[in-house]
């Protein structure tokens, strides 16, 4: 409406309240036409997706996670088809729990490949780290070290093995795990 009024030659004169508050059909058509044009359609790489899904399905057991990921893939396809903004509709942050050797790291790697194939991630690579890879021994260095690992993982997956170890030693003046957690949470909110 504002653009229509600004482009109208008659707007050089004083406009009435009615003119300023009237929305025309053309205004609405323009707004929705513009929003349709701005919708992002993900490019899905069907070959990469099939390979990643096959790799997931070859894993022994884990039927629940396989079903969850399959349903997520179908939902992302559906949203992409109807023009919903897939990238901002989902939180891709996940927590994998389980005993050692149950495949958490393997599933995280495969999920990165699936998200890349779906066009959600640029690179789909997995950066694996643990407490030692995030926490430094001096004040102020942990945030820098953690941010560096996060930057390395951008466009892919950051997998923090035994992330609970970041909370160990809470309250100790020599423990910087809380600083790493704060840095991670801030970047998760921002990116």
What label would you give each PLM region?
Residues 94, 127-129, 158-159:
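Hydrophobic positions in the central parallel beta-sheet of the AAA+
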């Amino acid at each position: 409406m504002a653009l229509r009024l600004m482009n109208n030659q008659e707007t050089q004169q004083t406009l009435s309240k009615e003119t300023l508050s009237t929305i025309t059909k053309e205004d609405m058509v323009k707004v929705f036409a513009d929003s349709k044009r701005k919708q992002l359609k993900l490019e899905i790489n069907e070959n990469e997706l099939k390979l990643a899904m096959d790799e997931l399905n070859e894993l022994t057991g884990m039927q629940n996670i396989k079903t969850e990921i399959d349903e997520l893939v179908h939902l992302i396809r559906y949203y992409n088809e109807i023009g919903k903004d897939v990238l901002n509709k989902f939180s891709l942050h996940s927590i994998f729990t389980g005993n050692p050797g149950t495949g958490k790291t393997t599933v995280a790697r495969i999920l990165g490949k699936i998200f890349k194939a779906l066009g959600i991630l640029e690179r789909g690579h997995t950066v694996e780290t643990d407490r030692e890879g995030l926490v430094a021994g001096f004040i102020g260095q942990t945030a820098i070290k953690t941010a560096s690992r996060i930057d390395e993982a951008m466009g892919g997956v950051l997998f923090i093995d035994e992330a609970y170890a970041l909370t160990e030693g809470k309250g100790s003046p020599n423990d910087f795990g809380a600083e790493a957690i704060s840095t991670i949470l801030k970047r998760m909110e921002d990116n």
